[in-house]
Regions:
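Periplasmic/ER-lumenal interhelical loops and adjacent helix-loop junctions
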Residues: 223-287, 341
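Membrane-helix boundary/interfacial segments in multi-pass membrane proteins
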Residues: 136-143, 298, 310-353
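Membrane-interface coil-to-helix junctions
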Residues: 21-108, 135, 140-144, 471
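Membrane-embedded helix bundles of polyisoprenyl
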Residues: 105-201, 212-229
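Signature aromatic-anchored transmembrane alpha helix within multi-pass, membrane-resident enzymes
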Residues: 217, 360-395
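Hydrophobic, aromatic-rich transmembrane alpha-helices
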Residues: 273-310, 354, 358-360
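Start-transfer (signal-anchor) and selected internal transmembrane alpha helices
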Residues: 1-29, 296-297
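Extracytoplasmic
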Residues: 392-571
Length: 571
């Protein structure tokens, strides 16, 4: 009895210690609360708004969100994770963000730990690799799109091995409802199809893989029906993506970048993983016949993972090289603007699973002292690299030396007290509620205004109306004409439908410490008035305000506020 109890404890203890390690990495968020720092790009300036609006209109049946861009289609602001919307429906935005962050960290650790154990990797190695994986700086706004891939693969493997099917189906559905079809789901479906084809050829696991595919497909279609109808049935207005002009790079530059540096959307610290994995493959190949059966199987798996990493890198570099980009631009449509190269989002899964396999081979095949020395050296290097690049490190820095970090916190970024003061002032002066007029932001992200209840004519969206892009262009046309970079940014891309200036471009992170002054700004305020835009919330003084029929109403600033907002009324 005692022996069985000890075995159960030994089996569960590493997992519980891993949960504690992940929770320790989360503690700075709880200590700092709204003073914690979160990378702004694509999170605070975009996806947080999609969750906020998605939750606000979850049950009202609206096909248009009136808060942004004078009313924008739901397809313009599709949340990457449907289940995360539910968090925002029952919690205020910041607690919802923190809860989602913790869920993503737990899923990352749990999935990688269970997957390695399923493949026969020692629990000590599985523990270390899974903790490192969970500490990678994932963008939690994308839900389980990247961090949850090990959990999905674990569920599929268990399904194919004939384990309890219902939990496997539940995990597959959980992943699909917590991830994005556009960002990674298409690649997941493609991988399941390829696996099913190989299974059919070998007459193994056909039913299980096909079931996993159709379950995943059903989940994604259910969430994205309106978007799929827009793309494939021509429903809705043409997207601004029709005018996107892709920019290519040299093939070798693209290949080197993705294989060595990776990408912020799928962080890996992979430059520290290349040498140990390559060394294991080299020496494992040389001494293959001397290895145990398990090590041979893991060596084959490591080789397969390395091959997939290389193939994905080649595909990414090919899709973005100058010659292919020119062809894509000429063909247009889905071929041009769909980023199929995002299959590199599999990289964290592939790299860290390969690391776990490599460490297990070292542990099993080398003499004990050599194995421990090699393992500690590899884990030490990788662990330090992961820790230094983690969100945990950023927020520990914020706790002790915020003045040297130079990143804005949630509280600073959204500056709720200052924007509440602006809202109250406008309501007292005009009697209008926020839904009765529109605002535009200059030098400040429009997301700040939206999250503070304002209705805007500007926003960050990767799929809004082409007609609206043309209408908005009238507002900033003169500033575009004065800057080739502005033209490239708006005309050839245009996801950030923002006010801009020739002096500062589309930069929109200006706190009061920058002392911004717009010396020669020329905006078409008549076009803004046609959109019912009554006010500009500017990060700096506009010296040409009178020439544009702008009246400075008031300057809003508090001692502890991040912004200094110049409120201009359009006359």
């Amino acid at each position: 009895m005692r022996h069985e109890t000890k075995q159960n404890v030994n089996r569960v203890l590493p997992f519980l210690l891993g949960i504690l390690a992940v929770t320790a990495g989360y503690l700075p968020y709880l200590v700092l609360r709204e003073n914690c720092v979160i990378p702004v790009s694509d999170q605070l300036d975009g996806e947080i708004v999609t969750y906020y609006l998605g939750a606000k209109h979850l049950f009202d049946g609206r096909s248009v969100f009136p808060e942004v861009m004078c009313g924008v289609s739901r397809n313009a602001l599709i949340p990457p994770s449907f289940l995360t919307v539910l968090f925002y429906a029952v919690l205020p935005p910041f607690p919802a963000f923190l809860f989602n962050q913790y869920c993503v960290l737990l899923a990352a650790f749990t999935g990688m730990y269970l997957l390695q154990k399923e493949l026969g990797i020692d629990v000590k190695i599985a523990f270390c690799v899974a903790v490192f994986f969970a500490y990678l700086p994932f963008y939690s706004v994308y839900g389980l799109s990247v961090a949850g891939l090990p959990l999905l693969v674990y569920a599929v493997i268990r399904l194919c091995r004939g384990r309890k099917k219902l939990p496997c189906y539940a995990l597959i559905a959980l992943y699909c409802f917590s991830s994005s079809l556009v960002l990674i789901g298409y690649a997941v479906l493609g991988a399941l199809v390829l696996a099913a084809v190989f299974a059919i050829a070998k007459r193994k696991y056909r039913k299980e893989l096909l079931t996993a595919f159709f379950l995943s497909l059903a989940c994604y279609v259910l969430q994205n029906m309106s978007l799929l109808l827009q793309v494939f049935a021509g429903n809705g207005e043409p997207s601004h993506k029709e005018e996107i002009v892709l920019q290519g790079v040299r093939f070798l530059d693209g290949l080197k970048g993705i294989l060595w540096e990776g990408n912020a959307y799928a962080p890996t610290c992979q430059k520290y993983l290349v040498i140990p994995i390559a060394a294991v493959l080299l020496f494992g190949g040389i001494f293959y016949k001397r290895c145990s059966t398990q090590s041979r199987n893991l060596l084959k798996l490591t080789g397969l993972l390395a091959g997939l990493i290389l193939l994905i890198g080649l595909f990414y570099a090919s899709a973005n090289c100058n010659a292919v980009v020119q062809i894509r631009n000429q063909i247009g449509g889905l071929v041009k603007y769909f980023q199929a190269d995002r299959i590199y989002w599999f990289y964290p899964l592939l790299w860290y699973l390969a690391l776990g396999c490599a460490l297990q081979i070292i542990y099993a095949e080398l003499p004990r002292v050599c194995a421990w020395c090699a393992g500690i050296a590899v884990l030490g290097c990788v662990g330090i690299a992961v820790l230094l690049g983690s969100n945990f490190k950023l927020n520990v820095h914020q706790m002790f030396k915020p003045e040297t970090l130079k990143m804005v916190s949630w509280e600073q970024y959204f500056d709720e007290a200052l924007y509440a003061e602006i809202m109250e002032y406008i309501e007292e002066e005009t009697g209008m509620t926020q839904s009765e007029y529109r605002v535009a932001s200059l030098g400040i992200q429009p997301a700040v205004a939206v999250m503070n209840g304002f209705y805007t004519i500007d926003m960050y969206s990767n799929n809004y109306s082409l007609a609206y892009k043309h209408a908005f262009r009238r507002i900033i046309e003169r500033e575009l004409d004065r800057s080739a970079l502005n033209i490239l940014y708006f005309d050839d891309w245009g996801n950030r439908c923002y006010l801009c200036s020739a002096e500062y471009g589309f930069a929109s992170y200006f706190g009061k410490q920058y002392g911004i002054v717009y010396h020669s700004l020329e905006l078409n305020t008549e076009a803004m008035a046609e959109m019912n835009c009554k006010y500009i919330l500017s990060a700096g003084e506009i010296q040409t305000a009178e020439e544009m029929n702008l009246c400075l109403e008031r300057i809003f600033e508090e001692e502890d506020s991040y912004y200094r907002v110049y409120l201009y009324r359009i006359e």
